[in-house]
């Protein structure tokens, strides 16, 4: 809030004002050319000034036409201003959404098929429930196998790193455990291969 100025024959003054608590401020003399802090313009660099002076509408479009143009979706303009990477990322997102939608449709169809009963015989119901239990256990075993494969690959990677260190001369005399690790390489490879075939 700007303070009210009072001009007198002796100069310019900021009039006395009342504080919120009821007490009064003294009037203050103002030197010639003084600009109060609230009235000092905020510094703006040349780029800010340029963008503020830039019209919001494109050349040739007046205010009356501008309101109808804003109602239209600006999707094509947004694509034109994006970089190659941003466009690629948008395409990936759209592709993921489509794949997710397809997966959801497949999942819904699968669930619908599970709900449908062709015949209401008790034997058929027992078979389907046994099949569901078997598929759940097979899912668990598949997950366990995948986990085991991951662990075996990690061990194999460690063996390969150890072999490289020995070959390049970092390790001159490998310890007994290191030699045992190297000897297990073939067994690890065979076990990984067997587990991958089971999956």
Swiss-Prot record:
<feature type="compositionally biased region" description="Basic residues">
    <location>
        <begin position="85"/>
        <end position="95"/>
    </location>
</feature>
<comment type="similarity">
    <text>Belongs to the pym family.</text>
</comment>
<dbReference type="GO" id="GO:0005730">
    <property type="term" value="C:nucleolus"/>
</dbReference>
<keyword id="KW-0810">Translation regulation</keyword>
<dbReference type="Pfam" id="PF09282">
    <property type="entry name" value="Mago-bind"/>
</dbReference>
<feature type="region of interest" description="Disordered">
    <location>
        <begin position="54"/>
        <end position="147"/>
    </location>
</feature>
<dbReference type="GO" id="GO:0000184">
    <property type="term" value="P:nuclear-transcribed mRNA catabolic process, nonsense-mediated decay"/>
</dbReference>
<feature type="compositionally biased region" description="Basic and acidic residues">
    <location>
        <begin position="96"/>
        <end position="117"/>
    </location>
</feature>
<protein>
    <recommendedName>
        <fullName>Partner of Y14 and mago</fullName>
    </recommendedName>
</protein>
<dbReference type="GO" id="GO:0005654">
    <property type="term" value="C:nucleoplasm"/>
</dbReference>
<dbReference type="GO" id="GO:0005737">
    <property type="term" value="C:cytoplasm"/>
</dbReference>
<dbReference type="GO" id="GO:0043022">
    <property type="term" value="F:ribosome binding"/>
</dbReference>
<feature type="coiled-coil region">
    <location>
        <begin position="83"/>
        <end position="199"/>
    </location>
</feature>
<comment type="subunit">
    <text>Interacts (via N-terminus) with magoh and rbm8a; the interaction is direct. Associates (eIF2A-like region) with the 40S ribosomal subunit and the 48S preinitiation complex.</text>
</comment>
<dbReference type="GO" id="GO:0003723">
    <property type="term" value="F:RNA binding"/>
</dbReference>
<keyword id="KW-0539">Nucleus</keyword>
<feature type="compositionally biased region" description="Polar residues">
    <location>
        <begin position="118"/>
        <end position="141"/>
    </location>
</feature>
<keyword id="KW-0866">Nonsense-mediated mRNA decay</keyword>
<keyword id="KW-0963">Cytoplasm</keyword>
<dbReference type="InterPro" id="IPR039333">
    <property type="entry name" value="PYM1"/>
</dbReference>
<dbReference type="GO" id="GO:0045727">
    <property type="term" value="P:positive regulation of translation"/>
</dbReference>
<keyword id="KW-0175">Coiled coil</keyword>
<dbReference type="InterPro" id="IPR036348">
    <property type="entry name" value="WIBG_N_sf"/>
</dbReference>
<dbReference type="GO" id="GO:0035145">
    <property type="term" value="C:exon-exon junction complex"/>
</dbReference>
<dbReference type="InterPro" id="IPR015362">
    <property type="entry name" value="WIBG_mago-bd"/>
</dbReference>
<feature type="region of interest" description="Disordered">
    <location>
        <begin position="1"/>
        <end position="30"/>
    </location>
</feature>
<dbReference type="GO" id="GO:1903259">
    <property type="term" value="P:exon-exon junction complex disassembly"/>
</dbReference>
<comment type="function">
    <text>Key regulator of the exon junction complex (EJC), a multiprotein complex that associates immediately upstream of the exon-exon junction on mRNAs and serves as a positional landmark for the intron exon structure of genes and directs post-transcriptional processes in the cytoplasm such as mRNA export, nonsense-mediated mRNA decay (NMD) or translation. Acts as an EJC disassembly factor, allowing translation-dependent EJC removal and recycling by disrupting mature EJC from spliced mRNAs.</text>
</comment>
């Amino acid at each position: 809030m700007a303070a009210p100025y009072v001009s007198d024959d002796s100069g310019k003054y900021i009039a006395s004002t009342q504080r919120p608590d009821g007490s009064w401020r003294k009037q203050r003399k103002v030197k010639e050319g003084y600009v109060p802090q609230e009235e000092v313009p905020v510094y703006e660099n040349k780029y800010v000034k340029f963008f503020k002076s830039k019209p919001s509408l494109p050349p040739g479009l007046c205010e009356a036409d501008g309101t109808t143009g804003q109602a239209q979706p600006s999707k094509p303009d947004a694509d034109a201003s994006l970089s190659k990477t941003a466009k690629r990322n948008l395409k990936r997102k759209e592709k993921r959404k489509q794949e997710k939608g397809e997966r959801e449709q497949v999942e819904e169809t699968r669930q619908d098929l599970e709900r449908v009963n062709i015949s209401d015989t008790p034997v058929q119901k027992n078979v389907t429930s046994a099949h569901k239990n078997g598929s759940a256990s097979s899912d668990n075993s598949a997950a366990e196998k995948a986990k085991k494969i991951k662990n075996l690959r990690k061990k194999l990677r460690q063996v390969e790193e150890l072999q490289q260190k020995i070959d390049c001369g970092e390790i001159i005399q490998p310890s007994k455990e290191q030699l045992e690790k190297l000897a297990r390489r073939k067994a690890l490879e065979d076990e990984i291969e067997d587990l991958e075939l089971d999956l």
